[in-house]
Amino acid sequence: DISVRSAQFYDKIRMEDKVMALMLDEEMDENVTTIKVIGVGGGGGNAVNRMVSDGLQGVEFIAMNTDQQALAKNHATVKVQLGSKLTKGRGAGADPEIGQRAAEESKDEIANALKGSQMVFITAGMGGGTGTGAAPVVAEVAHDLGILTVGIVTKPFSFEGKRKMGLAEQGIANLLMHVDSLIVIPNERLKMISQEKITLMNAFQAADNVLRQGVESISALINVPAFINLDFADVRSIMKDAGYAHMGVGSAKGAGKAENAAK
């Protein structure tokens, strides 16, 4: 019967289409690079919250903190309390040494959270206790696991004081020893380049936005299909053991927008 054969023929085509679609989905899943963004301390946690709120795609979020209350309020899907025995969940008290010891106490928990990653971004506000002291330890654990490790951190605004700046610079030096690439964003420069006036109220929001742009621009190159076709191997070859890195963000519209944005 012609009608029966026709129905069988189209059923076979539909089945082959479903199998092909399933194979393509599996291939895409295999090609997706597992990227995790780790917010360490209060500043890093705030940056992660901003990224989650902005709907950043293609990455997994982890918050790490000594402060139990701050951690409970964080929007990250994975949370790691650092140094629960040392700090009893009360934070590092703006002391980087306590932040470092807390992270060292929790190395196993850090490693478990990072497993399966091919690339991690470690974000923190330098100059405080947990971010400054713990971020280098987190980076060391990631690097020892063979994960491509990129730090994106901020230096304090001038109004935060010389002591905090000194702690930040020491923390950055420690972090540099354990990451493949390190992007340092001096918050004070945001006043010079921002299109809106930087005030005490919006200063840290502006810094969080720059941190988000840094993570988004690199992760999108790997996991978001685009005209510029870069895979993880390309990014790894550029960023592996690169030391200090620099980031530029530009935008433009209309004719010649790509060239104008680059300028």
Model-identified regions with their sequence ranges:
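Tubulin/FtsZ superfamily GTPase core signature
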Residues: 2-263
